Amino acid sequence: MLMQSIYLSKIREQNPLIHNITNIVAANFSANGLLALGASPLMSANVEEMQEVPKISQALVINIGTLIGKDREAMLQAGKTANEVGIPVVLDPVGVGATSYRRETIRELLAEVKFALIRGNAGELAAIAGETWQAKGVDAGQGEVDLKAVAEKVAQRYGCTVLISGAVDIVSDGTQTATVHNGTSLFPKVTASGCLLSAVCAAFLAVSEGNYFSATLEACVAYTIAGECAAQGLTTQVGQFQIRLLDELAALSPETIGQRGRINE
């Protein structure tokens, strides 16, 4: 099924400011990816700023990849402030199943903050859903569960949209579910490629006027198409792929999304 691009042009027109509380591995890549797409990144995790920064932003990303110092406190404060001013909040629960501290952090965030989108790999979403899964650190790992059912369960439980990233991406808001069949096997070879997808989703949500399911679906299609284009002619050249991905995000057009997007609903 083909899709019509609605939000990419709005990102380029509105240049939304995306507040990222992200990990030290992903910060540079996420910031440059947002710039390439047409959004503006703001990378701040200083707890003393968290009552102000969300008020000047159009979306917030909370990424727990490298929890350091007062990050947890900053995430909670930023999330609450974002909820107060009504901007969408994206949660990337990196490696949530790996340690008790990560699990406790996610439990507290989900209890205290209303999220528009939870974006993670299969292992991370299975952990949030309470399903058995053999995660490998912050990587997806392996398991034998129905991932569509996991996405729907988490979406219904927390009243949000869910995106499970993988060879086939799953998007659900608990009532409607779609799968995205674009992408490349090089994505898992580049660290923070999933973190950048979360930031890209935030940019799409920022201009969506509350239509979070359709915005997440288009964000996923757009990003995975950019990955396909970046991977053309490459096999193991992951360094070139990373640079090309930024180039393809900048070159991406609504027409390309409409022509190349492969989704099932």
UniProtKB/Swiss-Prot annotation:
Keywords: ATP-binding, Kinase, Magnesium, Metal-binding, Nucleotide-binding, Thiamine biosynthesis, Transferase. It is an enzyme of class 2 (transferase). Pathway: Cofactor biosynthesis; thiamine diphosphate biosynthesis; 4-methyl-5-(2-phosphoethyl)-thiazole from 5-(2-hydroxyethyl)-4-methylthiazole: step 1/1. Substrate binds at M43, A192. Its cofactor is Mg(2+). One of its GO terms (biological process) is thiamine diphosphate biosynthetic process. ATP binds at R119, S165. It catalyses: 5-(2-hydroxyethyl)-4-methylthiazole + ATP = 4-methyl-5-(2-phosphooxyethyl)-thiazole + ADP + H(+). Its EC number is 2.7.1.50. One of its GO terms (molecular function) is magnesium ion binding. Gene3D superfamilies: 3.40.1190.20. InterPro entries: Hyethyz_kinase, Ribokinase-like. Pfam families: HK. NCBIfam families: PRK09355.1, thiM. Catalyzes the phosphorylation of the hydroxyl group of 4-methyl-5-beta-hydroxyethylthiazole (THZ). Belongs to the Thz kinase family. This is Hydroxyethylthiazole kinase.
